[in-house]
Amino acid sequence: MSNDNCTGDIVTHLKNWNFGWNVILTIFIVILQFGHYKYSRLFYGLKMLVLWLLWPLVLALSIFDTWANWDSNWAFVAFSFFMAVSTLVMWVMYFANSFRLFRRARTFWAWNPEVNAITVTTVLGQTYYQPIQQAPTGITVTLLSGVLYVDGHRLASGVQVHNLPEYMTVAVPSTTIIYSRVGRSVNSQNSTGWVFYVRVKHGDFSAVSSPMSNMTENERLLHFF
């Protein structure tokens, strides 16, 4: 009889909460699937909020489980303590790497938990940032009728062939990688063509050049922090 009552309670609980969990999980699916900056800034902001809240939420739950099971279930205490320490370490690592990346690139993309590297392109006095997963060996820049694309992603319009930079940079938490222009095939008449950049050096450099500086482009890119 006790087992029947337990089963009945579980079925009743599922009936009462099934619709609510269905709605919550559907919202999570929409946020995770369409939470990209180019699709919807609202969903992207919600996605970042969920990711940022997961660390303190899991940490709080782990600490509570450790306290609740203290002196009654040491297996749960050990597991909860391990989860709390692991979450705290990952949280600290996130802030440390994000700060190091922000120190180089000076963009809010550095605080995105999904971003490991940022491509920095300066054209016509404007700096453009592109989040990527890892630093590439080479970067391909395409110019189609004055529209600038970096590895297939549109960055700017109204760009002429002579406006293309001599250098590009990619910032990662541990270093800044500088890419130099090594080859190109362009048509100046219709502002169409491609330019290829390869990495030439890396170090503790700023990934962002300052358009207000009187230094040359080369000097701006290579100045130390």
From Swiss-Prot:
Alphabetic keyword roster: Glycoprotein, Host Golgi apparatus, Host membrane, Membrane, Transmembrane, Transmembrane helix, Viral envelope protein, Viral matrix protein, Virion
Region listing for Interaction with N protein, in residue ranges: 199-215
Membrane-side (Virion surface) residue stretches: 1-10, 62-74
MF terms (GO), sorted A to Z: structural constituent of virion
Subunit structure of this chain's protein: Homomultimer. Interacts with envelope E protein in the budding compartment of the host cell, which is located between endoplasmic reticulum and the Golgi complex. Forms a complex with HE and S proteins. Interacts with nucleocapsid N protein. This interaction probably participates in RNA packaging into the virus.
Family: Belongs to the alphacoronaviruses M protein family.
Protein name: Membrane protein
Species assigned in the record: Human coronavirus 229E (HCoV-229E)
